[in-house]
């Protein structure tokens, strides 16, 4: 049986005018800034805050296979299912990055009949937010180099500039570059490098800001580097926070689109969860909470990455508690964690599912540590067998875990009604949400708590560089920031080949980065890179555009 591709399904779908989608949740035309017929930005200053804000449902997942487990698909499908049940609901998603779109994953707007549209536009540039973030980031780099070239009044040590340029592409050749070459007229030579745009602190700041004033304040606190006597230099010292915020004045506005079934969806911000905090913007989530009774959102990768950062970074900053958490599981991921090779994941193997269930179990237990009841969603794939699915259901029953088989890829919202009903039962109950750690703990203790309680490790080792940074950060007054771990998404450890639910391992912190504008400290583990590379056969090889301008092969 031949199945339509996600792109084919998207192209066959009928979109409603964006003003009608807006009207369905009470957004006036006055608050709407259309980008064509089917996309718009929202002027948040024209949205009336409400006292009883909508409840937030977070969607996370077990440790994924390289192809991903359909977290965005389940997020959209669950919201469509709430729509089926006549609930007032909105979706809040991250915007896909171009680099992974051309690399390994293809597009990232859901799949099958649980997609957000217009899919082509969202995956390719969308409303220009990533361009604005990239421009603001690189403008700051230009201001830094110009300041040094023009006499360096602040005494910036060009050997200790922490700020890097960015590009929305996977490009390993740009990880380390030299700039300012070619003689005195071209600036002062120094080592530099590029990160991918979604790892930019500007991206994190945009996603954690509540207003333009807040955005400007956070930008002003960015530490760009150090003087020759090791004193931090900030954007405020350069006096360019106003210019950078101006570049972002439209990008800070949430983007409104729709699901195939017409569920209003806000797509805004896109930090990765393995190298950044992995959540969509606070402004989009809070705007949705002012417009809907239920807001379904997601955080990147598993509970060890996006969900932990959602709880310990985003929720602290935003000031709301999650009402429920969905953990997406797939039979193929369970088999992978049970020892099955990638090429054999389509074959029935109940024993491998049994062996791999330990990975899902740890993710479920991680959510419980935050005081929220998890609901497992088995995201159905066509190669799953009844025996494999029944084993997972029996495991859930034995362990008193809520679970639902979810067929939203195939059936849209109707395929997610069972999941929606389970989530509704959790939403109606009080929870005892709490972050994993107190901010007053020293940085090393916060890192150790994440490693031992969420990852299952036994010890954290800090490189000599990281040890020096811990001391310096404490002296600078940065000890009370939350921690943003940069770690492989494929394993609880910092070794991506260590699957299942390993324990007793050590994690090495090789380096720390102070994101004083965004307000967190990044701890880099293992070989994690903030500028990814492309695979040997990138997804781009299967992409094209027709003579009349329609994309081909975009997932």
Curated annotation (Swiss-Prot):
InterPro entries: Formate_THF_ligase, Formate_THF_ligase_CS, P-loop_NTPase
Amino-acid positions noted as binding ATP in the UniProt annotation, renumbered to this chain: 65-72
Catalytic activity: (6S)-5,6,7,8-tetrahydrofolate + formate + ATP = (6R)-10-formyltetrahydrofolate + ADP + phosphate
Annotated transmembrane regions: none
Statement: the UniProt record of this protein carries the keyword rRNA-binding: no
Enzyme Commission identifier(s): 6.3.4.3
GO biological process: tetrahydrofolate interconversion
Pathway: One-carbon metabolism; tetrahydrofolate interconversion
Top-level taxon of the source organism: Bacteria
SUPFAM superfamilies: P-loop containing nucleoside triphosphate hydrolases
Molecular-function annotations in GO: ATP binding; formate-tetrahydrofolate ligase activity
NCBIfam families given in the database record: PRK13505.1
Protein family according to the UniProt entry: Belongs to the formate--tetrahydrofolate ligase family.
UniProt protein name: Formate--tetrahydrofolate ligase
Source organism (scientific name): Staphylococcus aureus (strain COL)
Gene designation per UniProt: fhs
């Amino acid at each position: 049986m031949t199945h339509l591709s996600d792109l084919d399904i998207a192209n066959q779908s009928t979109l409603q005018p964006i003003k009608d989608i807006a009207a369905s949740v009470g957004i006036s035309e006055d608050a709407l800034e259309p980008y064509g017929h089917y996309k718009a930005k929202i002027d948040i200053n024209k949205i009336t805050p409400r006292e009883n804000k909508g409840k937030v449902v977070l969607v996370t997942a077990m440790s994924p296979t390289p192809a991903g487990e359909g977290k965005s698909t389940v997020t959209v499908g669950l919201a469509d299912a709430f729509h089926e049940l006549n609930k007032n609901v909105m979706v809040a998603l991250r915007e896909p990055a171009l680099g992974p779109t051309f690399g390994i994953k293809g597009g990232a707007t859901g799949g099958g009949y649980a997609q957000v549209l217009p899919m082509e536009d969202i995956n390719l540039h969308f409303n220009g937010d990533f361009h604005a973030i990239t421009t603001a980031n690189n403008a700051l780099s230009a201001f830094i180099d110009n300041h040094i070239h023009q006499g360096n009044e602040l005494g910036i040590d060009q050997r200790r500039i922490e700020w890097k340029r960015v590009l929305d592409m996977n490009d390993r050749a740009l990880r380390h570059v030299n700039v300012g070459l070619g003689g005195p007229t071209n600036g002062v030579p120094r080592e530099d490098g590029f990160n991918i745009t979604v790892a930019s602190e500007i991206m994190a700041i945009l996603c954690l800001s509540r207003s333009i004033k807040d955005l400007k304040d956070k930008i002003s606190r960015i530490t760009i580097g150090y003087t020759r006597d090791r004193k931090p230099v900030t954007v405020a010292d350069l006096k360019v926070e106003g210019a950078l915020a101006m570049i972002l004045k439209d990008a800070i506005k949430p983007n409104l689109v729709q699901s195939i079934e017409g569920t209003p969806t806000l797509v805004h911000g896109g930090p990765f969860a393995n190298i950044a905090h992995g959540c969509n913007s606070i402004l989009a989530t809070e705007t949705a909470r002012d417009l809907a009774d239920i807001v379904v959102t997601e955080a990147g990768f598993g509970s060890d990455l996006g969900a932990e950062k959602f709880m310990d970074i985003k929720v602290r900053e935003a000031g709301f508690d999650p009402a429920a958490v969905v953990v997406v599981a797939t039979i193929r991921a369970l088999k992978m964690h049970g020892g099955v090779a990638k090429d054999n994941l389509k074959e029935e193997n109940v024993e491998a599912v049994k062996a791999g269930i330990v990975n899902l179990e740890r993710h479920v237990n991680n959510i419980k540590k935050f005081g929220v009841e998890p609901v497992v969603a088995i995201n159905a794939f066509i190669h799953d067998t009844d025996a494999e699915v029944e084993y997972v259901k029996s495991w859930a029953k034995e362990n008193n875990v809520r679970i639902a088989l979810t067929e939203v890829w195939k059936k849209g919202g109707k395929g997610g009604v069972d999941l929606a009903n389970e989530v509704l039962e959790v939403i109606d109950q009080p929870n005892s949400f709490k972050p994993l750690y107190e901010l007053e703990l020293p940085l090393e203790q916060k890192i150790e708590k994440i490693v031992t309680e969420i990852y299952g490790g036994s010890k954290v080792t800090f490189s000599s560089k990281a040890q020096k940074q811990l001391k310096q950060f404490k002296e600078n007054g940065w000890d009370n920031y939350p921690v943003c771990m940069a770690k492989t998404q494929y394993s609880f450890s910092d070794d991506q080949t260590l699957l299942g639910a390993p324990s007793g391992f050590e994690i090495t912190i090789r380096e720390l980065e102070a994101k004083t504008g965004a307000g967190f400290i990044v701890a880099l583990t293992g070989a994690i890179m903030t500028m990814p590379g492309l695979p040997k056969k990138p997804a781009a090889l299967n992409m094209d555009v027709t003579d009349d301008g329609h994309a081909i092969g975009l997932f």
